[in-house]
Amino acid sequence: MKIEEVKSTVKTQRIAAHSHVKGLGLDENGVPLQMAAGLVGQKDAREAAGIVVDLIKSKKMSGRALLLAGPPGTGKTAIALAIAQELGNKVPFCPMVGSEVFSSEIKKTEVLMENFRRSIGLRIRETKEVYEGEVTELTPVETENPMGGYGKTISNVVIGLKTAKGTKQLKLDPSIYESLQKEKVEVGDVIYIEANSGAVKRQGRSDTFATEFDLETEEYVPLPKGDVHKKKEVVQDVTLHDLDVANARPQGGQDVLSMVGQIMKPKKTEITDKLRMEINKVVNKYIDQGIAELVPGVLFIDEVHMLDLECFTYLHKSLESAIAPIVIFATNRGRCVIRGTDDIISPHGIPLDLLDRLLIVRTAPYNLSEIEQIIKLRAQTEGLSVEDSAIQALSEIGDNTTLRYAVQLLTPAHQNCKVNGRTQITKDDIVEVNGLFLDAKRSAKFLQEENTKYMM
């Protein structure tokens, strides 16, 4: 006898740098807690982000921009991701890095516009009318062929549908008769017909016929409940970029050339402004009719100092357009030269006229106790058992070097502790791995001391 254990099929995800961030960690009054939802400290920045989330939810923030500025390792990206978590899945959130705009295939401004359109959602509400039930009658009505001759054409189809609540007789278009034939619909089948599109779907055979045959490959379904005619509201969330792509890529024909074109990987094409304007017209028409509503999302541009002067000029125009998302920038630069210029120095590497339009949120470096809390949180997220003395040693390393370096030492220290036959990371493991790996400051010091031995 063979007995096998059923293994769990729970989806495991890689633990990333910000896996522990679950939200902004604010109370019901919008006041930040010292340690909540995976964030520690940065109370002012989190409170400001909470106000931004409220503005986004009330749709009063679109077309405005926010800048998260602070030294490296102070939680700028974590706050941006926490904003995304707070907004939920229904609001589009599009993260990108400043260097992504440089491509050999398409223009920088095109990449920016593409991400702008990805950050703007459209919620389409559609009322679908559906006829559902068991087929009690299926009669095609024939008429004389209008073209003459002896052939007959089908003018309409009379179909009877039955549910637990009642029956209805419908007169259908001849085009639906073809769909009924394709689905191989017979009397006794349970089907549904969409009134708007005329789509027919056979769900299976009614379970009242289950005893009809001994050998049967049919799937038997119960008689539908409720009325034959049902109205159902379907809500669909799409982004403007989805609409652009759907209309920019026409479907190929049946000839050999179109098949070859589909097999060969096409070069990335630019979506024209004309097409976008046409889509905007259709979207505005839908909004006026009340069919759709616009959902301004968030475009997060990390390392914004990597953009050049052309991109910043384009951002000006885009932020002032009628359909614009909320843009969040993040940078760790102080005063530096604006990319694309020779000698124009500006705060954060952003032109002054754009800086003037931004709300700036500052993130401050963490103190020793906050670093300790973050390291505890990361150890918990990675499922590691760490002694208090080891956490204290790591906190001191993080205070002297960087928080990222201290967090990165956790996994090598765990490996070292496993090799030594322990289950808990001790201070000795931390000291040992700190001696094996260098941080940026110590590495720079070695370079300075042994400058002559390296190639220039």
UniProtKB/Swiss-Prot annotation:
Protein name listed in UniProt: RuvB-like helicase 1
Keyword Transport set for record: no
Role summary: Acts as a transcriptional coactivator in Wg signaling. Proposed core component of the chromatin remodeling Ino80 complex which is involved in transcriptional regulation, DNA replication and probably DNA repair.
One cellular component term from this protein's GO annotations in UniProt: nucleus
Binding residues for ATP: G70, P71, P72, G73, T74, G75, K76, T77
One GO biological process term: regulation of cell population proliferation
Subunit-level organization: Forms homohexameric rings. May form a dodecamer with rept made of two stacked hexameric rings. Component of the chromatin remodeling Ino80 complex.
E.C. designation(s): 3.6.4.12
Reaction catalyzed: ATP + H2O = ADP + phosphate + H(+)
Organism: Aedes aegypti
Pfam family of the protein (one): TIP49
GO molecular function: ATP binding; ATP hydrolysis activity; ATP-dependent activity, acting on DNA; helicase activity; transcription coactivator activity
Keywords: Activator, ATP-binding, Cell cycle, Cell division, Chromatin regulator, DNA damage, DNA recombination, DNA repair, Helicase, Hydrolase, Nucleotide-binding, Nucleus, Transcription, Transcription regulation
Homology family: Belongs to the RuvB family.
Name of the gene this protein is made from: pont
Broad class of the protein's primary localization: nucleus
Intracellular or extracellular location(s): Nucleus
SUPFAM superfamilies: P-loop containing nucleoside triphosphate hydrolases
